Amino acid sequence: MARNAEKAMTALARFRQAQLEEGKVKERRPFLASECTELPKAEKWRRQIIGEISKKVAQIQNAGLGEFRIRDLNDEINKLLREKGHWEVRIKELGGPDYGKVGPKMLDHEGKEVPGNRGYKYFGAAKDLPGVRELFEKEPLPPPRKTRAELMKAIDFEYYGYLDEDDGVIVPLEQEYEKKLRAELVEKWKAEREARLARGEKEEEEEEEEEINIYAVTEEESDEEGNQEKAGEDGQQKFIAHVPVPSQQEIEEALVRRKKMELLQKYASETLQAQSEEAKRLLGY
C-alpha cells in the first residue's frame, strides 16, 4: 500500500491539484516579514513555514539521499528556522502572541547544535556526515596528573646518571673528547713556551729550581723557633717551644697522681698532708 507522500507525487494527483488551483491567484509569502501588516496573514505564513520545516525534517531522516542532498536539506531547514523567527518577531510587533516564549520548541529540539556555531543545527542523517560526527564527539579526558609521591617512586639510580656508562656509548665519546682537549692544551703550552723563549724569559722549571723551599726546617731554625718570644694579647711574654708528646703510660701515671692529690686534699688533715709532702721531698719524688 503506497504512502500518502507517494500518492501525492503521482501524475493524477498533480493534475487534480492543478485543476483546483486553476483560476485562483496564488498568494506568495512576502520576502520580508516587515512587509506584512496584517496579523492573520502573519500567522498564516508562520504556519506555512512550520509545515515546510516538518516536511524537510522528515526527508532528511533518510540516510540514502546522498551527502550533497542531505547537506542541502539541512541548509534549507536552518534557513526556514531563521525565517520563522523573523515572522514570530513580526507577529509580536502586530500585537499577537510571543511565540518565542509560549510557542512549541519541538522543531528546535530535533536539531543538534554545534557549540560555537552561532545557532546552526544538524538534523537527522546530517549528524552522521563526514566531518560533522567528529564535532559532536566529546574530547577524551586528560590523564590525571601524578602526585609528587608517585613521581618520586619512579626515581632510581638511572635518574641521577649513575648508569650512564653502562650503555657503552658515552665512555668512548668522553675518552675521545679528553684526548682532543689534552692535545689542545699541549699545543697551547708549547706556543706559550716558545713565546717566552723568544722574549728571553727563563723557563718555569728553572725558576722552580731557583726558588727557596719555604717549608724546609734546619736545626738552627728549629732552635730559634724554640727560643723565640712573642707577645700575647695581654702584653706578657710567651715562649713557644717544641716539647715531646707524652706517651699513653705517662698520661695514665699523671692522672693517678692527680687523683691521689685530690683524695688527700679531701680526706687528709693539714698535718698529714705536710708529713706526706716532707716524705716525698726526702725520697726525691
UniProtKB/Swiss-Prot annotation:
Gene3D superfamilies documented for this protein: Helix hairpin bin
Subunit: Identified in the spliceosome C complex. Component of the XAB2 complex, a multimeric protein complex composed of XAB2, PRPF19, AQR, ZNF830, ISY1, and PPIE. Identified in a pentameric intron-binding (IB) complex composed of AQR, XAB2, ISY1, ZNF830 and PPIE that is incorporated into the spliceosome as a preassembled complex. The IB complex does not contain PRPF19. Interacts with CPSF3; this interaction is in an RNA independent manner. Interacts with the microprocessor complex subunits DGCR8 and DROSHA; this interaction is in an RNA dependent manner.
Keywords, in A-Z order: Acetylation, mRNA processing, mRNA splicing, Nucleus, Phosphoprotein, Spliceosome
Residues with Phosphoserine modification: S247
PANTHER family, A to Z: PRE-MRNA-SPLICING FACTOR ISY1
Cellular compartments per GO CC: catalytic step 2 spliceosome; nucleus; U2-type catalytic step 1 spliceosome
Protein name: Pre-mRNA-splicing factor ISY1 homolog
Region (Disordered): 197-244
Cell compartments where the protein resides: Nucleus
Annotated GO biological process: generation of catalytic spliceosome for second transesterification step; mRNA splicing, via spliceosome
Pfam families reported in the protein's UniProt record: Isy1
InterPro entries reported for this sequence: Helix_hairpin_bin_sf, Isy1, Isy1_sf
Family statement: Belongs to the ISY1 family.
UniProt biased composition (Acidic residues): 203-226
Modified residues (N6-acetyllysine): K127
